Structure formats: structure tokens, C-alpha cells
Amino acid sequence: MSAVVESHDHHHGPAKGISRWLFTTNHKDIGTLYLWFSFAMFLIGGAMAMVIRAELFQPGMQIVEPEFYNQMLTLHGLIMVFGAVMPAFVGLANWLVPMMVGAPDMALPRMNNLSFWILPFAFGVMLSSLFMEGGAPNFGWTFYAPLSTTYAPPSVT
């Protein structure tokens, strides 16, 4: 006589709620996380752009100190390039590339998830530099040093 044992693997179903987004290995979910992060950074960078434009509305200081203005200008450029544009491309790539090549998922899906979760932490550290002693970098969004600070090493004759 044989006994039939039922499987009780109810806890192995698809994740729901917040754990779906925290621990996902699905390329579409990770792509969606990148796209939402990109949108949030676009809003933060856009708010900085509005402060920058309001400061430039008239000559003189209206809203922020000159040093804070330069810091905000630098972080605005960093956020828009490395926080909005590049994560949007990565999010679209996470969504589309596996479907285009016929793969079920990205290679190394857990590392794909980890690479996303490093991003909010890094941008949190970068944004917190605005409010730390010493402040954020303040050399403009192009990262060019002013021409008045150029240094020419002594020439060898």
C-alpha cells in the first residue's frame, strides 16, 4: 500500500508586497525599479533646476548663498546625468534586452538586483553632502576648473 503525501510548498509562490521589489530577480521588476528611480532623480534634479533658475531671475542673491548655489549646480548636473539619464537607459535595457535575445532573464540576476540597490544608497550619500560640513562639490556641472586656477608646471628646458 502506498501513501500519497501532499506537498505544502505554499511559501514558495511568487513574492508579494515589498519583498517582491526588495529581493526580485525578475528583469522586468528590476528594470521598473531603475525607471522609477530615474523618475525620482529627475524630479529632484528638476527641483534643483527651478531653484537655480529662480536665483538667476534677477541679479543679486534671492534664495540661496553663492556657495550653496555652486554646490547645487554641480549636484544638479550629476543627478540629471548619473541619476536620471543613465538609470533610465539601464532600466530600459533590463526590460528589453532579455526579451530581444529570447533569454528568460538577465545573467546573474541577484547581482543585477544588488547593482540597483547600491544606486539609491550612493545618491543618498551624494545628496547628503549638501548638508554636511564642508559642503558638496562646487565646481559646476561640467567639472571644469575655472580658468583662473589653471596651473602650468614649470617647463623643462
Regions found by a protein language model. Give the residues of each.
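...captures the hydrophobic TM-helix bundle architecture rather than a specific catalytic motif
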Residues: 1-157
